[in-house]
Amino acid sequence: MSILYEERLDGALPEVDRTSVLMALREHVPGLEILHTDEEIIPYECDGLSAYRTRPLLVVLPKQMEQVTAILAVCHRLRVPVVTRGAGTGLSGGALPLEKGVLLVMARFKEILDINPIGRRARVQPGVRNLAISQAVAPHNLYYAPDPSSQIACSIGGNVAENAGGVHCLKYGLTVHNLLKIEVQMLDGEALTLGSDALDSPGFDLLALFTGSEGMLGVTTEVTVKLLPKAPVARVLLASFDSVEKAGLAVGDIIANGIIPGGLEMMDNLSIRAAEDFIHAGYPVDAEAILLCELDGVESDVQEDCERVNDILLKAGATDVRLAQDEAERVRFWAGRKNAFPAVGRISPDYYCMDGTIPRRALPGVLEGIARLSQQYDLRVANVFHAGDGNMHPLILFDANEPGEFARAEELGGKILELCVEVGGSISGEHGIGREKINQMCAQFNSDEITTFHAVKAAFDPDGLLNPGKNIPTLHRCAEFGAMHVHHGHLPFPELERF
């Protein structure tokens, strides 16, 4: 199969007529709410990455799963692209609508279908909020582990699409590690069950394949998640440092000593001051960096680990280490971290949130590199990230009202992601690729790998109608971007024009 000319997978879509699609949906999907006027669709023109905006052809809001099947059948027959949207909190433009496509909003599917405390699992619809799962199972002393900062709003369907993580993913894993099975609706009408209620299933791991596929392979209609028992005890240490490099080295020292914290987060001075002004978490505003280290388990183990981590932090150069004295202070420490993004939004007209992953050993050097790039592009960068697993979230501060600043912020963001790749990391940790990072995929993967990605997509979506132009670039795009891998002086596909 040739992928070179599958341009529809990169945004070159067939012409469609709004009226004909609207009439077909009204005819074949009774009772469906359809938004089609400019006033109605404006609220859906972006996801959490509000710098990118496109108004869709139509917005559909089904309330029954049979309607989802019928919507996909109509779009399949008319060859109309479909972008699926959950809560719209994504930060990479993954749910950015297409001007020639239908936006399928799954937000009304908010029912928790079943809770099995003995089997430690819950079966939920895709529009259920992440935090709502933990709230629903709390009476059973259980919770759902992945906890992205947007957990009060983000949906579990969106979490599956992006393979979301959170501040506790170092110990408890990403979304993919906390799923048992999902129900998926394909564009051609086929329904699949991926995974099972058992902890392992024979055959290819299609559940893992779909998790993080950003709505490019199918539409998630039901999710069965694993539940964990709440730890009897959780303690948080807050360590202050006079340099981000020392804080970065301390992260590696903790892990090297065989300690796996429930959460291990870092913030630099700019983000510390912003969060403290916003939340009053008790952060030291004179520190160049802080580490938040949460240890959980049984009382005796936690007490021992707290003493060990305290010593490790001081030996690594911490100027001060504080142990949260009670649950209220522990919650306050975490509130500052979880509200760091909106806190930074209060000190800058706009900010651009990046998401890259690096090996822990590379943390000090990458932080130095980001500081150099910040000076080069004359844009401030606040660093907030999951230090334990090297998942960085540099926040690039800019003013969109200043001509050229957003373009400069985009370019700086791209350079930071390429720096992550250079040191053996990845251009995404949990936010996905979407439209935002599609060019950097050309730096992360070679042409053979990208061709394989397209082959996988074509196996599930041969017409390329599910969320086209996202996640996977065409080879043409990589040629234009100029980032295709050159091996022994040989440039793949030399017949493609370079720009």
What are these regions (language model features)?
Residues 1-73, 90-120, 149, 269-280, ...:
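N-terminal flexible segment immediately upstream of the FAD-binding catalytic core
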Residues 35-45, 225-229, 235-412, 419, ...:
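C-terminal substrate-recognition/cap domain of FAD-linked oxidoreductases
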Residues 439-499:
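Activity-critical C-terminal alpha-helical subdomain
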